Amino acid sequence: MKALSKLKAEEGIWMTDVPEPEVGHNDLLIKIRKTAICGTDVHIYNWDEWSQKTIPVPMVVGHEYVGEVVGIGQEVKGFKIGDRVSGEGHITCGHCRNCRGGRTHLCRNTVGVGVNRPGCFAEYLVIPAFNAFKIPDNISDDLASIFDPFGNAVHTALSFDLVGEDVLVSGAGPIGIMAAAVAKHVGARNVVITDVNEYRLSLARKMGVTRAVDVSKENLNDVMAELGMTEGFDVGLEMSGAPPAFRSMLDTMNHGGRIAMLGIPPSDMSIDWNKVIFKGLFIKGIYGREMFETWYKMAALIQSGLDLTPIITHHFGIDDFQKGFDAMRSGQSGKVILSWD
């Protein structure tokens, strides 16, 4: 079958021919319809320091997808041939304390699809049936293919009660923009998103944020004054991993503010911990999605009217995958969809 693989320990992704995966007793075989390119896939393409330490070569990559069930392991219940599914990209162990306690998103032995085991940039994917999620009929293939990153956004945004709150989102990548849209949809008062990429800030405006702020040109305190905010942000969603953005968030949070961090900062990021202590801030780390509460909320948010379609900016056939990666690497895109049909 055709598959996009990290074939060599250098920059790039290659179209390869690999054997079709075998279906285990508890697995589903999924025929891939559409996939989306994640920032993680760009890291793997660029072969940065993280990728060199993490990715075995060769490896079929990718973890954002929608497809159709075409094979079912003999122990699997609850699925049938023809079901349209996406799936949780974190394969969990099932036997650690968190897994056994129902907190599977906190599994200490997580294996990543397209990172530690073969991924979805292929004609077929095998995953445990436990990880599959049936897509409702009224949700399109395009939207279903981005459920994985949308789940990051939902998990982060819904970490705290947002009704009536003023929310700061730092980082206008696709996940940050979707988190801002979720915050607005569920009843936040002001949702302010910051970045230095004007293309992506304009995408955020299309998604309905209160203010999209280019912090290289505007002062966040001036924006707060313009919005009539006198006490700071109630909730911060840190999606950038950029130390200056996080420090600015700490500066502008209200006392007792709550911060959810999805962005991965450099390991040596320094902050003024006095601001955390004396403001009484609460900081929560976010990894992946809650299994599977986040997935049900994702479907419900879309079914209740949340419009994510502006975040999908590019479509390519799989033979034009290089154009898709070029678009993602340029920073002048939202989500990029690759079609396998």
Swiss-Prot record:
A UniProt-annotated Pfam family:
ADH_zinc_N
Primary location: cytoplasm
* Residue(s) at site: Important for catalytic activity for the proton relay mechanism but does not participate directly in the coordination of zinc atom: 148
Q: Which residues bind NAD(+)?
A: 175, 195, 200, 262-264, 286-287
Q: Tell me the residue numbers annotated for binding Zn(2+) 2.
A: 93, 96, 99, 107
Q: Where is the active site?
A: 40 (charge relay system), 43 (charge relay system)
Q: Which GO terms describe its cellular component?
A: cytoplasm
Q: How does it assemble?
A: Homotetramer.
PANTHER family linked: L-THREONINE 3-DEHYDROGENASE
Q: So what family is this one in? A: Belongs to the zinc-containing alcohol dehydrogenase family.
- Role: Catalyzes the NAD(+)-dependent oxidation of L-threonine to 2-amino-3-ketobutyrate.
Q: What is this protein called in UniProt?
A: L-threonine 3-dehydrogenase
Q: Which organism is it from?
A: Enterobacter sp. (strain 638)
The gene it comes from is tdh
